[in-house]
Each structure stands twice: as C-alpha cells, then as structure tokens.
Amino acid sequence: PAKARACIFIFLEGGPSQIDLFDPKPKLNALDGQPLPESLTKNVRFAFIKKESAVLLGSKRTFTRHGQCGMEFSDLVPHLAGCADDLLMIRSMHTDQFNHHPAQLVLHSGRPFFGLPTAGAWLTYGLGSESQSLPGYVVLSAGRGTSGGASLWQSGFLPSVHAGVLFRSQGEPVLNLTNPPGLPPELQRRGLDA
C-alpha cells in the first residue's frame, strides 16, 4: 500500500461558504427563504442572528460531479474540480462552536482552546520532513492573517520544530532569518552550540 509523504491542507478563512463550493445541500435549497425551524433554534442563543426574522438561505451555485470518483464541485471552482480524483474531501466535520476563533481551533487542533498541537504539527511529527534545512510545515497567508493567528499552526506540547513557519506575501517573506544589526556571527554560533 502507498504511504503518505505530504499533505496540502487548504483553509480559507473568509472564503466562500462550503455550501457554495464543495458541499451541495439540496434540502436547504428546497427550503430557501423559509423561517428557521424550531428544531434549530429551541434553547439556542445566537450571537448575531435574530431568531424571529432569520430565514434559511440555500446556495445559488450549480453543482456537477467530476472525475471517476464523482465528487461534486460548484461552478465556482472548475479548475479544482479537474483534480477531483487526486483530492480527499471531508464533509462530515461539525462543531458546537459558533464563534470563528474557537471553531478554527477545533478544526486545527481538535479542541476549542490554546496550547494543543495542530494537525500540521502532528503530520510533521508523524511523517517527518524530507529536509533538515527546510521547514516541514509551512503556512501561506494572503496578508491579512487569520482571526486565530499563530494558534492555528502552533506545535503545542510537541517540539517547536513541528510548528508551522509563516510565509508572508508582503515584506520579509520569513521573519528572523537574518541576524540583527550588530550581532557578530560568532556570538550567534556560541549561542547555538551552548
């Protein structure tokens, strides 16, 4: 059997909803515009939704099946749909967290609090890295960052070598690669050798 050597995890904070990209909801589309059912609102406090006036909103996108696997994609991602047979899609995840940051922590670490290794940290811990001189886990950012910040790529209680390295799209691509002005290289070497 094949053994995984790498993983590309795409997390699009602020991106389109999954129901407009990868997760068709025919029943939701059939109920579009109708009030929220009591089964969803009873004994639930919402931070930003007025239960009395809230209505269900289905997707306006068109979904079609792609590849031999028949994975469904919306018309918003035609190029990604062309890779359907090379992708793994997980549609069974859910959370009781309704605020973004705790929900993001659940997605990345399995729990809604700080200090735990993220999925990327566990992957580098388990799979290792093909290079000792390059990071095994990198994070790409569009520039504005995430509401979860570095807590979404931390190593938690695993050694820090398993934390994600942020690659920035603006300014210095990777922070702290050069010595501060005035720090002699031999002083840094002594610190590393200590």
Regions of interest found by a model, annotated:
Residues P1-A194:
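Ligand-binding pockets and gating/stacking loops
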